[in-house]
Amino acid sequence: MLMPKRVKYRKQQRGKMRGKAKGGTLVHFGDWGLKALEPHWITAQQIEACRIAIMRTLKRNGKVWIRVFPDKPITSKGIGVRMGKGKGDVEGWVAVVKPGKILFEIGGINDELAKEALAYAATKLPIKTKIVPRYEIGGEL
């Protein structure tokens, strides 16, 4: 599972997800990319499920780039624990994804197989996504 090796602070505040993605909005490495259209927290398990789905479709051909990394700790208190007494323990890690962010890239295979793999990976995510080519002319997102 993806997670940071070490962090400066164990716990973070939740924060807001306003606006569009500042960086990582263009396909740089591969020929096709999967672009997020909604803001959401993507968990490490969801990223891994997408990676496995893509690899199964590609059957060891081509190359995959994962453009998001879960670096935000998510905490929760145990069931039946009363309020107060400090923040809960770290339960997992998420990547903060804003609209326009490229999540995955695929290269080195034909276009039909790349689109099929990314469409299958998109079913594993809780957000709306769009398959984009390397060079997309026009369009805000």
UniProtKB/Swiss-Prot annotation:
One GO-annotated biological process of the protein: translation
Keyword set, alphabetical order: Ribonucleoprotein, Ribosomal protein, RNA-binding, rRNA-binding, tRNA-binding
Membrane-spanning segments: none
Any one GO CC term of the record: cytosolic large ribosomal subunit
UniProt-recorded Gene Ontology molecular function terms: rRNA binding; structural constituent of ribosome; tRNA binding
Function noted in UniProt: Binds 23S rRNA and is also seen to make contacts with the A and possibly P site tRNAs.
Family the UniProt entry places it in: Belongs to the universal ribosomal protein uL16 family.
Subunit structure and binding partners: Part of the 50S ribosomal subunit.
PANTHER family per record: 50S/60S RIBOSOMAL PROTEIN L16 (PTHR12220), LARGE RIBOSOMAL SUBUNIT PROTEIN UL16M (PTHR12220:SF13)
Protein name (database record): Large ribosomal subunit protein uL16
Organism the protein comes from: Kosmotoga olearia (strain ATCC BAA-1733 / DSM 21960 / TBF 19.5.1)
